[in-house]
Structure formats: C-alpha cells, structure tokens
Amino acid sequence: MIDYTVFKDKKAVYYTLGCKLNFSETATIERRLQEAGIRTAKRGEKADICIINSCAVTQEAEKKCRQAIHKLVRQNPGAYVVVTGCYAQLSAEKLSRELGVDVVLGIDKKGEVLEHLGNLVKHSDGGEWYAQPAKDVRNFVHSCSRGDRTRYFLKVQDGCDYFCTYCTIPFARGRSRNPHVSELVAQAQMAAAEGGKEIVITGVNIGDFGKSTGESFLSLVQALDGVEGISRYRISSIEPNLITDEIIEYVAGSRAFMPHFHIPLQAGSDEVLKLMHRRYDTSFFAQKIARVRELLPDAFIGVDVIVGTRGESEELFDKAYEFIKGLDISQLHVFSYSERPGTQALKIDGAVPPAEKHRRSQLLIALSEEKRIAFYERYIGKEAVVLFEKPRSGMPMGGFTSNYIRVETPQNAESVNRLVRVRLGGFNEDKSALIADEIIGFAE
C-alpha cells in the first residue's frame, strides 16, 4: 500500500544514460511519479528524490553513472536516491554501497520505482538492492514516453537472445520478450489522443518481436500503421538478419512508416563479424542495404559500427573502412570497443591500444560526416514535409523531414507539432541542418 501523503510537495530530478529505450523508460517513471503528486524539479531547484537510469554498455557509461550519483547527492543533500537500469542490474550490490544511494532496482523492478520510495527515509547503513538474475526475468515493463509531445518513444520489446561476444546486454536486460500487438496498438492510440504525431519504435532487439506471443514484427508494423492520428512512425534499430524483404516492402508502401532505417553493422570485415558472433556477413549486409535503396531510394540509412574490437588488426580495419565507404548509407554511429567483464570477447587475442581505437574512430566519424552532408545536399532546393518540435529558448525551431533530414527555421509557435511543407535551402552554419528557405503551408 502506497502512502501518497508522503509525496506531498516533493520534487524529483531524473538523470538518464544510454539508449533511446532508457530515455523512454525514464519518461514513464517520471510520468508515474507526477501522477502520484511528485513534481519534476526545475533547473536549480533542490530535489527530494533523485532517479538515475543507468547504462552498462561501456566502462565510460558506468563511470558516468557513478559520477552522476555523486553529483546529485552533492547538489541535493538529504535526497532519496534510486538507481535503476542496466548497470544497476549487473552491479546492484556494488552500487548500493555508493555514498547516498538508498535503493538499487534491477530490470524486473524498473516499473516499481514508486513502490520502492517507501516513506523517503534515507538508509544510514547503506542502500537496499533488488535484482534477480536477468535470465529469470519474464515480466515486460511497458513504456511510452511523450517527451515534448511531438515524438513519442514506444517500447515494443525487451531483452536479447543473441549473446554477441562483446556485449553485456543479454545479462543486463534478460531474454527476448514482448507484449501483445493489441497492447501496443492501445498505447499508440493513447499517444494519438494526447496529440502525438510521431512514434519511434524502440526495444533492445525489436526485429525479434513476437517470441512471447506468437506474433511477428511485421504484424506489429501493420497494426500500428492503422492507428488514426499518428502521422509518422520510425523504426529505431533493427538487426540486418531480421529486417526481411517483407518488412522493407511494407514500409515502402506504408501510410505512416517513414523511409528511415537504422541497421547495426558493428564490423566491416567478415573475420571480425565472425569473432563477434554476428549472424550475417558483409555480403549479406550489402545486399540488405541495396534492397532498401531499391525500394526506398530516398531513405535515410544509419549504421552502427564498433572500432577496435579484439582481433581487429590494422589490415582488417582498412578492409572494413573500404567496405563501409562503398555502402550507400547516410550516417554512421561510431563506438570504440569497451572491454566488459564476463563477455566472451575477453578470450580473443589481439587487443587494440586506446590511441589506435581513437584514430580509427576519428576516421569513421569523418567518413560519416561526408556521407551525411552528401545525403543532405541531394535535397537542397526540393520540397519536403517537416514535423517541427518545440524549440529551446533562444534557439531556431527544428524538425525532421520524412527521411530524417534535420531542418531549421526561425521560431513560429503555430508550426510546433505540425506537419509543414517547406522548400529546403542550404546548410546552417555548422552544417548540422538545412534551412527552410520557404514555408509553403501546412501539410495536414
């Protein structure tokens, strides 16, 4: 039984590390606490409750989590501190001993933050922790964040059964699981009722959707496409072996699914892909990109790449660079390999020095910018429909075209959360966006 009177006049602050899924889950936690009467603290206000949603994909992410705990404890003396997320799952007992931490919640308890706030009495002798082994977790914690009420993030799947050699996510998130399509359609309908226009479909391995319910990712896409009021959907990230021709073909003819794919490659040589235990080779990946381009020539295609994994010699990196350079893609998300305890990758010979990882990373980041700018340049002078978002104070108003080109224009309150037809001009000062040369009118 929750005593809601304890939360009267209380304020909370939230700190999130990691992926879009984590941000979605934090927003859901925040929403639940607000419904219980806990206000989100404004900038500079002292909070009574601190919620940290952690990440464990790299050593740096874990370090940032510990730094965030120390900073929030220092800035909010006496606040009740809760840590959840992937790092909390993997190192619950360790985190419970961090100065100021009251409760650490593993993945199975992530949806129960409110229940674990108790009477907000701090623990003087160290924090409590609740985390069962990820392999035993079967529950699915729903999440649909509304953010700025323009773009929603809908969690459709959790966990992963792939066990790539470099990755701790299966140990932090558990086995692949999902709710029924009908439940997710209901959440999309709620987002539409609140005025949402765009939904980003998120998860850990969303193409694996359906294992828990006997459904499929394609059936989910088809059902969501029929939700009235949602003008746009984006597929956040999908494994190359799970993005079937049927999915690509459906998106190509879809009412609301945008020509935008994010497909993780992770390594550009067959030798390293094999060391990683990925489920495809470079030939398969290239064919998949070509198929997307054939059916959706204007699609924005983002690709994840990890540099400096064990076993990636300089020769293999050069081979990977040339392969990636030849792909007709729009942008790269580049990550430096981080050694994670308990992973099979630690058994592989050929560790890459940090300086060499950095060099390789910078080469691919530069290649990514070349590809993104070249993609943007194709659309200068053309008309496009942009969904504009609420601007930050003093900043231009920004939004995205259907194929994920960032567009900026002077602030105009009437255009916020509206689909607006514009004529695309040249680049802004730092080339991060195109300027809307002309506002043609609303496209809805």
Predicted feature descriptions by range:
Residues 22, 58-61, 88, 240, ...:
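Alpha-helix N-cap/loop-to-helix initiation residues
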Residues 263, 304, 324, 332, ...:
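Hydrophobic, well-ordered secondary-structure elements that form the walls
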Residues 1-208, 222, 246, 261, ...:
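Proteins enriched for Cys/Gly/acidic motifs involved in redox and nucleic-acid/cofactor modification
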Residues 312, 327-329:
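Contiguous mid-protein beta-loop-alpha structural module that forms a pocket-lining wall or clamp
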Residues 330, 343-347:
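Short glycine-rich, low-complexity segments
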Residues 81-82, 90-91, 95, 193-315:
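Conserved SAM/AdoMet-binding glycine-rich loop
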Residues 147-150, 160-161, 257, 267, ...:
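Short flexible coil/turn linkers enriched for glycine and charged/polar residues
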Residues 347-444:
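Terminal RNA-binding accessory module
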